[in-house]
């Protein structure tokens, strides 16, 4: 029995190829009695690349328990995409057979406490990074209320398991499987000499642990959350934890395993 009637939102970038796929997929979904709904969807399909999936995530980050995501790539296979632009019929068929099954990944919760009492709350699917605007950043790192180290360097990034393959990996961090619900704190160009020392390697903390960053100066710091950038002054502290909510993807026969994604992105075919 065909499973139609689901509410679906399509989100695409403005590139001509993505717009062409958007038009074609919209037509196929309508012909198969799916409902296009941009307000209260059951499924969100991003068309483009991983950056577009991040945008879709942030559009619906306050409805994570109600929606599932599908990534449709118009270029090379990405970490969050299961379909290519020439697989529209396959995608529609799998949607018709969808049972509601899902694959879930952890999300990062970030709280920025300002000295005036304001609290800014963000969610990140990949990572959140902090840098000082114009000079060396100095910040105390506290884990579960216990002082760990004083960091000096360009900045720090905290990543999710799925985000461990992004900026974190380029900094020399470890790649974590998303079933490991943990956060990874990675240094950005730390200052290490006879006077100043840091651990010099990534720190991986389990689900229930909390990482706090306490800047020692009250000037401007730049905080990036996935593909968005913010500037704050007079930061009292920043708290990082695994969020209570997860992102859910539609589980289909086309869902690519995590290690296959890693292999495709960084290794490719291995010669025997």
Swiss-Prot record:
Broadest EC class assigned to this enzyme: transferase
Chain sites annotated for binding NAD(+): 50-51, 126-127, 152, 154, 165-170, 189
Keywords: ATP-binding, Cytoplasm, Kinase, NAD, NADP, Nucleotide-binding, Transferase
Cofactor(s), by name: a divalent metal cation
InterPro entries noted in UniProt: ATP-NAD_kinase_N, ATP-NAD_kinase_PpnK-typ_C, NAD/diacylglycerol_kinase_sf, NADK
Chain coiled-coil ranges: none
GO annotations of cellular component type: cytoplasm
GO BP terms: NAD metabolic process; NADP biosynthetic process
Keyword Transferase: yes
Enzyme Commission identifier(s): 2.7.1.23
Reactions catalysed: NAD(+) + ATP = ADP + NADP(+) + H(+)
GO molecular-function terms, A-Z: ATP binding; metal ion binding; NAD binding; NAD+ kinase activity
Localization: Cytoplasm
Keyword presence, Isomerase: no
Active-site feature positions: 50 (proton acceptor)
Pfam name, any one: NAD_kinase_C
Family of the protein in this entry: Belongs to the NAD kinase family.
Record function comment: Involved in the regulation of the intracellular balance of NAD and NADP, and is a key enzyme in the biosynthesis of NADP. Catalyzes specifically the phosphorylation on 2'-hydroxyl of the adenosine moiety of NAD to yield NADP.
Protein name: NAD kinase
Lineage: Bacteria, Bacillati, Bacillota, Bacilli, Lactobacillales
Annotated gene: nadK
């Amino acid at each position: 029995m065909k499973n139609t009637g689901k509410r679906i939102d399509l989100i695409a970038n403005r590139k001509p190829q993505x717009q062409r796929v958007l038009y074609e997929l919209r037509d196929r979904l309508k012909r198969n009695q799916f409902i296009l709904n941009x307000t209260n969807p059951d499924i969100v399909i991003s068309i483009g690349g991983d950056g577009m999936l991040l945008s879709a995530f942030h559009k619906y980050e306050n409805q994570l328990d109600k929606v599932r995501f599908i990534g449709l790539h118009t270029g090379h296979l990405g970490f969050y995409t299961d379909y290519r632009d020439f697989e529209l019929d396959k995608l529609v068929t799998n949607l018709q057979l969808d049972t509601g099954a899902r694959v879930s990944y952890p999300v990062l919760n970030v709280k920025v406490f300002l000295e005036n009492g304001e609290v800014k709350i963000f969610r990140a699917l990949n990572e959140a990074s902090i840098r000082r605007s114009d000079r060396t950043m100095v910040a105390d790192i506290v884990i579960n209320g216990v002082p760990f180290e004083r960091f000096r360097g360009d900045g720090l990034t905290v990543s999710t398991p799925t985000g461990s393959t992004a900026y974190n990996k380029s900094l020399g961090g470890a790649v974590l499987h998303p079933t490991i619900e943990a956060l990874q704190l990675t240094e950005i160009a730390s200052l290490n000499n006879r006077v100043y020392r840091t651990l010099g390697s990534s720190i991986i903390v389990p689900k229930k642990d909390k990482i706090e960053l306490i800047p020692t100066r009250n000037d401007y710091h730049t905080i990036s959350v996935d593909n968005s950038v913010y500037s704050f002054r007079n930061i009292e502290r920043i708290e990082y934890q695994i969020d209570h909510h997860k992102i859910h993807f539609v589980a289909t026969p086309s869902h690519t395993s995590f290690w296959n994604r890693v292999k495709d992105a960084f290794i490719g075919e291995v010669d025997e």
